[in-house]
Amino acid sequence: MVFKIADSIISPLGETTGENYLAVKAGRAKLCRYDHHWQIPEPFTASLLTEEQNQRLKIEGLTRFEAMAYHSIVGALRQTNLDVKAKNVVLILSTTKGNIELLAEQPADKSPIYPGTAAQHIADKLGITTTPITVCNACISGVSAIILALRLLEAQCYDYAIVCGADTQNPFTISGFQSLKAVSDEACKPFDLERTGLNLGEAAATLVLAREPHQDKGWAIKRGAVRNDAFHISSPSKNGEGARLALAAITEGEAAEGLAFINAHGTATMFNDQMESVAIERAGLNETPVNAYKGYFGHTLGAAGVLETILSMAAADDHTILGTRGFEERGVSGKIKLSNQNAATNGQQFIKMISGFGGCNGAILGVKSGEVNSERVNSEKLMTHTVEITPKAVTVDGKQMACEGEGKALLTDLYKRYIDNYPKFYKMDPLCRLGFVASELLLQAEGDRRDTPRDDRAIILFNRSSSIQADEAYQASIQDAEDYFPSPAAFVYTLPNIVTGEIAIRNHYQGETSFYILPERNDQLMQQILKASLGDKTTKSILGGWIDYEDDENFVAKVFVM
C-alpha cells in the first residue's frame, strides 16, 4: 500500500485538480469539433488546450509536451515539502507518444523523440537526480505507472514516487486513430447504444505517492494488477478475460459492498465498452455503480489512468459518483449500473480499470487508509536462460547459433531457420520481429512451451528508442499532403508494448505485460523493476530484458527468463 500526498491536473477544463473536479461535477466539457485542424482532412471532436493555455504553460528549452508535464508536477510538488534532489525520490512518466509531433520535422537526430529523453529533460528541469522511468504501455500507461510506483515503494527502492501522466494531440495520433475508424466526429457516448467512437484529449496529471502515510486517513493505492487478453493486438477479447483477471487480482478478499464505484475506461468505442461490461459482470461487480470520464476530457492516452484516478479520489471525498457524460441508454450486454447523473455515495474505496492495445488491461484499488499494509512477496529469482541478438550474431545461453545475413536480414534468417511456423511474423514491425524471434529462441531453450493459457508468467521489456521504426513508417503515410493515406497497419505498431502483446498471443500468456523506456540502458535499474514486479503474487516467472531497434543496422535484444 502506498499513500497519496499531493496531486495536480492540467486539462482544457482547468489547471488544478479542484478546477477540473468542479467542472466535471457541473457537467462541463471542452470537447469541440475541428474541421481541417492541423490540415487533417477528416473532422474530429477533441478536448485540446487553448492557445492561451499553451502560451501560459510554455517554458524555454522544453517542448509543449514536456512543459505541460512539468507544470503539472510543479503544481503537485507545491503541496509538499519534498526534496526532489534526494536519492529516495523517483520520477515515473506515463505517456504513449510523448514528443512524437517532432517527427514531422524529419530530424536527423531522433533521440529527442524518445520518451525516455523527454522524461530526462523534465527530471533535469525539476532537479531530480535519480533516473526517470517512462511507462509506455498503450492506453493503460497511467495505471501501469501507478502500479510501478506501488511496487517500487513497497520494495523499499524509494520512499517517494512522482507519477505524471501526459500526452498532447497532433496529426500523428489523431490521424492514426482515424485510420482505425475509432474516432467520432461528435461528442463521445460511453457505453451508450448510439456510441460511434472516441474523442481524443490533452492533459497532464500528477500523483505524488509516499511509502508511509502523511495523514491519519488519506487516499492510498492498496493493490494493482496488469493482465493480458492474449487475443489480439488491437481488439479486446469478447469475454474480457484480461480485464476480469485484473479485477479478480485486486478484489481478492475485498467486500464489493465497500466500493463507491468502478471508474471504467469507457472510450465509447464499440468493442472496448462491450468488453468492459462483460468483464465487470464476470468479476461479480455488476451491482457496483460504474462511470466513465471520457465525455468530459476525451481520451487523454498516457494521462488517462492518472487523471481519472485523481478525479475518482476527489469525487469519493465529495461523496459523489460522477455521472457518465454522453450516456443515455445502455448499449452493452454486460448488466452494469450506469447513469449520466451525479449520485451520492458513502463508499471509501473505488476501482480504476483500463485497457489498451497489445491486449493489456490494468486495475487498481484506491482506499481511504492511514495504515501501512504491505503485501510484498519474495522477489529473489535467478536467470535461467538468456538470448542475445545483435545485427551480426545471436547467442543462446552463451552459445553462438548458426545464422546468415546481417541487420534486418538476420532476423528473417533466424525466423526461417529456427521457427518458420508463424506467418504473422511478416506483418510485424522491426521491433516486434526482434522481440518475437528472441522470445522464440528463449522459450525453445527453456523447453516449456504450453498450448493452454497461463497467467503466472509476466512479459516485462525495456528499451530506449520506443517504437521509432514503426513511428517513421506511419509518419511517411501522412507526411505528404498530396499523398496522404494514414496506414492502420503501420499505426497499430507505433506503441512499443505491442511486442509484449505479440509474445503473449503467441504463447497464450495472460499474465502481466509491461513496457518501460529508459534514457539509456541501465541493467541495475531494470533488475530493480523486475524484482519489484514479482510483488504481484500471481507472477511466478518473468520473460524480461532489453529490446531496442533504432534502425536496421542498430538493434539489440538481450532477453532472459527469471
Predicted regions and their residues:
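Conserved "HGTGT" condensation-loop signature of ketosynthase/thiolase-family condensing enzymes
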Residues: M1-I133, N137, R151-E154, N170, ...
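Short conserved active-site loop signatures built around small residues
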Residues: G142
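Short, conserved alpha-helix that lines the donor NDP-sugar binding/gating region
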Residues: I146, L150
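Alpha-to-beta junction loops
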Residues: C157-D159
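Glycine-/small-residue-rich beta->alpha transition segments that form the dinucleotide
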Residues: D167
